[in-house]
């Protein structure tokens, strides 16, 4: 078994030999991402001691949800955030904690001044761009937030900016934990049962290859899967009567996943950014990029197909047991063949801690110390 290296930052350990073009595409994407320079530390030698969760980029909303002149509320677990655009410069987006640091009023009803300040309605305290917490970025039609991020930009979705591809976004709240949501995105066995009325086939995936990736600069570990899938009758009509599609799935810990379905010269990419809302509720931000159809009607057809599939996932996610020590003890006592990737993903989540109010308080205390040192 060989180990490949793409730049020094990434080690790639294939579980099986490399044989598919989808995987080679994945390697090129990883190489490009390795070249991205991580954001330098801003006086923060170590992340919050509980875990590094807030240092990863988190999608907190779609771009069209954050409008000029109106505060936007987003929660990352128990961390309450308020986001606003500067009316004078709509490309300037700021974020702070949705608790006024004067006397504790919520800021989601604050006024946004002409100069781009967020003005608390209790006593008139104004938040300028020096009162922000963390970094906020608009990327590929979504709003991302991170505190002292490892990477300078969020991860890219393949082909998103390709002029030959149509793109669209969806948002779904699932009654399931972040862990269950993550495992679902990399599980290639459930479509036969959950998506039998969609793309699911009773023919199991073939030529499964499983891979792991590490980026030491950005403190991320990613998992990859490549496989061939036999289309059912419905999907063959969509896929120009092509019987077999080539597929590549990737999960970038802790909250980002994308999949690539390819046949002939056609490609469909589904990106999923996961946002934990509670311990057992997760928001899925779905990005669709494809060159199946060029028309707006074709774009709506693909959105409708994705919505149908998400409703099927929603029904299963509601049936997941809530997170508990008992569930963790039972999970994967039974493992099917070729499930090394989802088992490894579950192992990655052993270090995950739900971002509860104590972690949020620790983050703010560390932020406050950093601010005090800069004065």
Description of each model-found segment:
Residues 1-18, 22, 34:
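N-terminal chloroplast transit peptides
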Residues 27, 55-59, 71, 144, ...:
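Intrinsic-disorder/low-complexity, polar/charged segments enriched in Ser/Thr/Lys/Arg/Asp/Glu/Gln
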Residues 57, 69-73, 80, 133, ...:
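Short, acidic/polar N-cap/turn motifs at the starts of alpha helices
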Residues 58, 102, 123, 190-196:
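Histidine-centered active-site/metal-ligand motif
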Residues 61-164, 368-375:
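Rieske [2Fe-2S] iron-sulfur-binding domain
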Residues 150-375:
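C-terminal catalytic domain of Rieske-type non-heme iron oxygenases
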């Amino acid at each position: 078994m060989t180990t490949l290296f793409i730049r020094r930052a990434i080690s790639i350990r294939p579980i099986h030999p490399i044989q598919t073009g989808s995987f080679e595409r994945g390697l090129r994407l990883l190489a490009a991402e390795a070249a991205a320079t991580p954001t330098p530390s801003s006086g923060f030698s170590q992340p919050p001691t509980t875990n590094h969760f807030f240092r990863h980029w988190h999608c907190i909303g779609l771009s069209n949800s954050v409008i000029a002149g109106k505060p936007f509320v987003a929660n990352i677990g128990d961390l309450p955030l308020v986001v606003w655009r500067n009316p004078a410069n709509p490309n300037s987006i700021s974020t702070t904690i949705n608790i006024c640091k004067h006397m504790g009023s919520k800021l989601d009803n604050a006024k946004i001044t002409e100069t781009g300040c967020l003005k608390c309605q209790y006593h008139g305290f104004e938040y300028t761009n020096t009162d922000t917490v963390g970094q906020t970025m608009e990327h590929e039609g979504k709003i991302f937030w991170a505190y002292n991020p490892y990477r300078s930009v969020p991860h890219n979705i393949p082909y998103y900016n390709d002029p030959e591809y149509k793109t669209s976004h969806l948002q779904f709240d699932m009654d399931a934990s972040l862990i269950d949501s993550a495992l679902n995105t990399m599980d290639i066995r459930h479509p036969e049962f959950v998506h039998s009325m969609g793309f699911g086939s009773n023919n199991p995936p073939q030529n499964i290859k499983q891979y792991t990736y590490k980026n030491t600069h950005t403190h991320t570990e990613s998992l990859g899967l490549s496989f061939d899938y036999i289309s059912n009758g419905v999907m063959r009509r969509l896929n120009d009567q092509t019987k077999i599609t080539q597929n590549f799935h990737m999960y970038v810990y802790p909250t980002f996943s994308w999949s690539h379905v390819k046949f002939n010269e056609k490609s469909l990419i589904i990106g999923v950014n996961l946002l934990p809302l509670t311990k057992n509720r997760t928001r899925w931000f779905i990005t669709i990029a494809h060159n199946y159809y060029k028309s707006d009607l074709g774009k709506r057809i693909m959105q409708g197909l994705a919505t149908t599939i998400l409703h099927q996932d929603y029904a299963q996610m509601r049936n997941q047991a809530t997170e508990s020590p008992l569930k963790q003890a039972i999970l994967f006592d039974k493992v099917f063949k070729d499930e090394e990737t989802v088992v490894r993903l579950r192992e990655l989540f052993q270090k995950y801690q739900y971002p509860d109010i104590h972690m949020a308080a620790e983050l703010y205390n560390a932020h406050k110390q950093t601010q005090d040192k800069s004065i």
